[in-house]
UniProtKB/Swiss-Prot annotation:
Pfam families: Transket_pyr, Transketolase_C. The pyruvate dehydrogenase complex catalyzes the overall conversion of pyruvate to acetyl-CoA and CO(2). It contains multiple copies of three enzymatic components: pyruvate dehydrogenase (E1), dihydrolipoamide acetyltransferase (E2) and lipoamide dehydrogenase (E3). Its cofactor is thiamine diphosphate. Heterodimer of an alpha and a beta chain. Its EC number is 1.2.4.1. It comes from Gracilaria tenuistipitata var. liui. SMART domains: Transket_pyr (SM00861). It is found in: Plastid, Chloroplast. Signal peptide: none annotated. Its main location: plastid. This is Pyruvate dehydrogenase E1 component subunit beta. It catalyses: N(6)-[(R)-lipoyl]-L-lysyl-[protein] + pyruvate + H(+) = N(6)-[(R)-S(8)-acetyldihydrolipoyl]-L-lysyl-[protein] + CO2.
Length: 323
């Protein structure tokens, strides 16, 4: 086992897959000589050169189209968004081309592309650079969506995403790049469609993902000290949702809390509630509690920015309100 920071875990995954398969390449703003805005591509340019580590202009729609075209020809591009919010400028390419071409071509085209980069609230990046786009992409047919939360799952998921023959949106959080974890020395992969049982429990199921996993686990320490026994599941796969794992937990605890950094209106939590109400409503002993970010642009001011997202005390209060 080796202790690794998250940005290094992502870099290792990329490096290993580029060594394994010459069709894998990465492109994006400052991914080459600079090594990426959060150093995920550090030293890869010197190792693989301009043809496989491409610095692009500030033209997201153009280089996304370039990557999709490369994928159609059999290459495996990794697109790094310097900030995931910038990918709104490539929304047409992601939706109408990456997401739909395999279907609209009758299966003649595969689009093995990974679109990854930093997002989420933190570092006082302002409203335009703090967007949570997972709900935007969730509505697009043909996409897979994952959100990493630890160095361990970041590496295993990214390696699986690169080898997948479908477009994968890969969310990383700006505040988790310096998170440390122990990684196996042997190669490993993690499934793109499975949730992770983080903590077994009986009283209530808490669903979460990305940065909020760590806020939930901070809350769990106090909850356990107060005699509560929550079950915690990291969704990881935001599309498709691992509804089977969610349902199995709900059948045991009969209470559900969703903790997300996504906006409440039309967010990931809203989709989970819809699916639970459609298929597993009879297993609920209490209304589902949803803790989400406020439906406002993220303020630049640090105190106001912090006030828009969920913190451990709110999670503790939510558990005590239904258990």
């Amino acid at each position: 086992m080796t202790e690794v920071l998250m940005f290094d875990a992502l870099r290792e995954a990329t490096d290993e897959e580029m060594q394994n398969d010459s069709s894998v390449f990465i492109l994006g703003e400052d991914v080459g000589h600079y090594g990426g805005s959060y150093k995920v591509t550090k030293d890869l340019h010197s190792k693989y050169g301009d043809l496989r580590v491409l610095d692009t202009p500030i033209a997201e729609n153009s280089f996304m189209g370039m990557a999709i075209g490369a994928a159609i020809t059999g290459l495996r591009p990794i697109v790094e968004g310097m900030n995931m919010s910038f990918l709104l400028l490539a929304f047409n390419q992601i939706s109408n081309n990456a997401g739909m071409l395999r279907y609209t071509s009758g299966g003649n085209f595969q689009i093995p592309i990974v679109i990854r980069g930093p997002g989420g609230v933190g570092r006082q990046l302002g409203a335009e650079h703090s967007q949570r786009l997972e709900a935007y992409f969730q509505a697009i047919p043909g996409l897979k969506i994952v959100a990493c939360s630890t160095p361990y799952n970041a590496k295993g998921l990214l390696k699986s995403a690169i080898r997948d023959n479908n477009p994968v949106i890969f969310f990383e959080h700006v505040l988790l790049y310096n998170l440390k974890d122990e990684l196996p020395n042997d190669e490993y992969f993690l499934p793109l469609d499975k949730a992770e049982l983080v903590r077994d429990g009986l009283d209530v199921t808490i669903l979460t993902y990305s940065r909020m996993r760590h806020h939930v686990m901070q809350a769990v320490v106090d909850l356990v000290n107060d005699g509560y026994n929550p079950e915690v599941i990291d969704l990881i796969s935001l599309k498709p949702l691992d509804i089977t794992s969610i349902a199995q937990s709900l059948m045991k605890t009969h209470k559900l809390i969703i903790v997300e950094e996504c906006m409440k209106t039309g967010g990931i939590g809203a989709e989970i509630i819809a699916q639970i109400n459609d298929n597993y409503f009879d297993f609920l002993d209490a209304p589902i509690v949803r803790l989400s970010s406020q439906d406002i642009p993220t303020p630049y001011n640090g105190k106001l920015e912090k006030a828009t997202v969920i913190y451990p005390q709110q999670i503790i209060e939510a558990v005590k309100s239904i258990v």
